[in-house]
Amino acid sequence: MEPEFPISVRFEDGEVEEYEDADDLIHNLEDFDSDTDTGCDVRDARGRRVRLKLKLLDLKELSLA
């Protein structure tokens, strides 16, 4: 199964941002790894944990964790 949009990211400071599609993720996060950014929590529209990896504006992984 694939994650369902919108994707929500809760950052270490408590701020939550929502992304409507893959392009929105790429253009607004640019460089992000949910495995190494341990203070962040990434969830899909159904509240499921998501593994998200972006490197230099390239979406490397978007899957259920």
Question: Model segments located where?
Answer:
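Short, extreme N-terminal segment that most often corresponds to the first beta-strand
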Residues: 1-19
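Low-complexity intrinsically disordered segments
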Residues: 34-65
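Short, flexible N-terminal segments of the mature chain
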Residues: 15-41
